[in-house]
């Protein structure tokens, strides 16, 4: 939250929740941050917390460029009524899980147990998704053996 307050404006949340259940640990209320520069860590890193950094962009192209500028690519989403915008987003965004108009469920965008889940770039496992057909191979040591009897 210090970074959000330093580089932008905390529009909503940003505090530690009240109550005994939150006494120990690193809990934070759902938070919306605006006004941070697009080069801020708030747009460049993955924060596994309920934090949303909002930036104003002039076009879908600028939004996709901003999303792809991060070295991470776990999940990305778009809300649109225009099918051509969703299609362009799906074709160009560099993330392992992509969704459009998803309003409920997991914040990752994937439906756990139904869809594979994994990131691209420095998110995840080299593009191999959990539940995907090749995911288990990363935990195995492959070996080729040839025996010629003569």
What is each PLM-predicted segment?
Residues 6-16:
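Short secondary-structure junctions
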Residues 20-150:
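Conserved C-terminal structural/oligomerization subdomain of aldehyde/semialdehyde dehydrogenase
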